[in-house]
């Protein structure tokens, strides 16, 4: 079983900023550049690894299993991968790749070609004309084609040295586009696709050569950037079209009190894209996305998913502080808001109160980003209704019943900073609580600005003590650069 090596937990270079972390600042101009994180553990292709391949099956059936999942190496690897992709996207615009008629050359090109092939099926498979109450049954025809052709798709995608891993990889790809039985889609399917990408990454699929590096390289960062800014937006376009074409139901949606009916990760990655600038602030993004110059002029005839993701918009001057040059456009956060405006009618604060509260209450994108990470961990990765469908195999995502004692945990407020640097998504025991999202089933206080405080915020000391000289740090694995000062 692949284990987390010491490199995952070791500080690569201790950054010692002289000022307090911008994450703890209430300034509207607080920003943070991209940070270096420790490398993901790779999967070595060896005889023992090949012998460990098994068909993934579901393992999470109880809340006890959810706790075991949160304490597992698989959880830590997934959350680190998500953070690495986010860091690679900081300050950069979305780039939706176009469909090429040329033969794909690089691994990324092959993956892009696969997604465009899947998108073409959506146009080919017509919805059933007979009125249907819960989604269109033609989506099952789409799913049947995927199940029929997935082995050939993976055979064309993977190099020969990785063909044996198709047994495990196919399960995650099949689960990435929705439930063909229930005709629905939700954040669990989004999780499956991102887990599939992480599996490919760890196998060395994206590597230029078969030599797999253990340390972070420029090539790794470039691959993560393409995953976040090219591949994931293209996947988002594919599933948005599926939702529209076949009327997919939201899977496990909180309704009006949820962040989004279908997606979550676009808000996490989108907040990372906006984290380095303060020209477009959270309290202005709702107004910008609903401005008449955008919805009625720039996007008047282009409200399809591809246009919402790829169009470089000219933001209204009233929504900006300073110039527009520093705002990365397009970005996934704004694209997701535009998608909501296209699909829903009425005042934004009524049909999307949580997004509205975040925009009006959180002072800067740095806090939005860390809050989204914390909320994703609490509302998706820690919810049985979401992760119960996640499958575990023998190589890529491995199930264990016991917690990994080697994973660092923050036990007391006096724990050293170095012990807190590698906790994915602020993974402190007892700190992965809900963001305060009320639902019909569970009554909780409404979300407040404090909900988006730093995920590693410590409780107040019960007795007076000498002020610490160690600054707080964001919940990133390891930083080689100090966090910049607020503007």
Curated annotation (Swiss-Prot):
Pfam families given in the database record: PTPA
Gene3D superfamilies named among the record's database cross-references: 1.20.120.1150
Highest taxon of source: Eukaryota
GO annotation, biological process: mitotic spindle organization
Region of interest: Disordered: 1-28, 426-487
Assigned EC number: 5.2.1.8
UniProt keywords, alphabetically: Cytoplasm, Isomerase, Nucleus, Rotamase
Catalytic activity line of the entry: [protein]-peptidylproline (omega=180) = [protein]-peptidylproline (omega=0)
GO molecular-function term, one example from the UniProt record: peptidyl-prolyl cis-trans isomerase activity
Primary location group: cytoplasm
Record's subcellular location: Cytoplasm; Nucleus
CDD domains linked: PTPA
GO cellular component: a single term: protein phosphatase type 2A complex
InterPro entries (alphabetical): Phstyr_phstse_ac, PTPA_C_lid, PTPA_sf
Family indicated by similarity: Belongs to the PTPA-type PPIase family.
Function: PPIases accelerate the folding of proteins. It catalyzes the cis-trans isomerization of proline imidic peptide bonds in oligopeptides. Acts as a regulatory subunit for PP2A-like phosphatases modulating their activity or substrate specificity, probably by inducing a conformational change in the catalytic subunit, a direct target of the PPIase. Can reactivate inactive phosphatase PP2A-phosphatase methylesterase complexes (PP2Ai) in presence of ATP and Mg(2+) by dissociating the inactive form from the complex.
Official protein name in the record: Serine/threonine-protein phosphatase 2A activator 1
Native source organism of the sequence: Mycosarcoma maydis (Corn smut fungus)
